[in-house]
Amino acid sequence: MLYQQIARNKRKTALIMVLFVVILTLVGAGLGYLFSNRPWMGIIIALAGSLIYLLIMWQNPANMIMSLNHAQEIQEADNPELWHIVEDMAMVARVPMPRVYIIPDPSPNAFATGRDPNHSAVAVTEGILQLMNREELEGVLGHELSHVRNYDILLSTIAVVLVGVISFISGMASRYIWFAGGSRDSDDDRDSNAFEMIFKVVAIVFVLILGPLSASLAQMALSRNREYLADASSVELTRNPQGLISALRKIENSQPMKQADRSSAGLYIENPFHNHGLSHLFDTHPPTEDRIKRLEQM
């Protein structure tokens, strides 16, 4: 059951990443059509923009995210117990020892970030250290180091880049349509046939509405899917689903965080603001009860 869940989640992740690229390509094509009647030019701009943005984000994402969440780096002497648990779980996961941070917040939570296993970092709140025993901490840190081992930290960075580029393209197209009236010149309008007008309307709707909406939904689906995978991988590392189950219940019943950055919400083991939508489509995390049910089946 455990390995079947891991394999299924990896397949879902691959499909979601393909969907991201398809959405980006279609949005780029729509942009190229609206601006110059050359869809291929828009596709090149979208892909090149994504690559440039990714290279910028690649430099040092961990430091930026830790700063946004008010996390403070520690050494072994500052908290030997936490340090040794992270060290032990990193050894079991066969990843390099990440940098360790503590967030001064009484609500229990944790997250991992970085660009790859060699440049990773984990952060836990003061609340999680106070409320959880070693078994529960191992479950939580096993989950976070699974994100590192499974390259979820890289996937989340790529997802942020793709959503950012799609949103930028949508905003640029919106301004163009507002100031230029959505057409290239009056002669084009007189000469355009019904099919061309239909294509133009479809391009506008997709670039301005459906593209950004689809990208956001794909990003949320990716985040939820990687949480399931990290849960399963944590059990693979600890051989003890009860530790993570108990930890998730404590986090679910806690107060929202005060120090968390909203743009980083998807990185945490559980939504730090405890706000869940009715449909769950825009949730960054799966429902806690669903996660616990899956863990109980392992």
From Swiss-Prot:
Family (UniProt): Belongs to the peptidase M48B family.
Assigned keywords, A-Z: Cell membrane, Hydrolase, Membrane, Metal-binding, Metalloprotease, Protease, Transmembrane, Transmembrane helix, Zinc
Record protein name field: Protease HtpX homolog
Cofactor binding: number and manner: Binds 1 zinc ion per subunit.
One GO cellular component term: plasma membrane
Disulfide bonds: none
GO MF annotation list: metalloendopeptidase activity; zinc ion binding
Residues annotated to bind Zn(2+): H143, H147, E227
Subcellular location(s) of the protein: Cell membrane
EC number: 3.4.24.-
Positions annotated as active site in the UniProt record: E144
GO biological process annotation, one example: proteolysis
UniProt xrefs under PANTHER family: PROTEASE HTPX
Bilayer topology annotation: Multi-pass membrane protein
InterPro entries referenced in this protein's UniProt entry, alphabetically: HtpX_protease, Pept_M48_protease_HtpX, Peptidase_M48
Lineage: superkingdom: Bacteria
Organism: Lactobacillus helveticus (strain DPC 4571)
Segments forming a coiled coil: none
Segments passing through the bilayer: 15-35, 39-59, 153-173, 197-217
Cofactor(s) needed for function: Zn(2+)
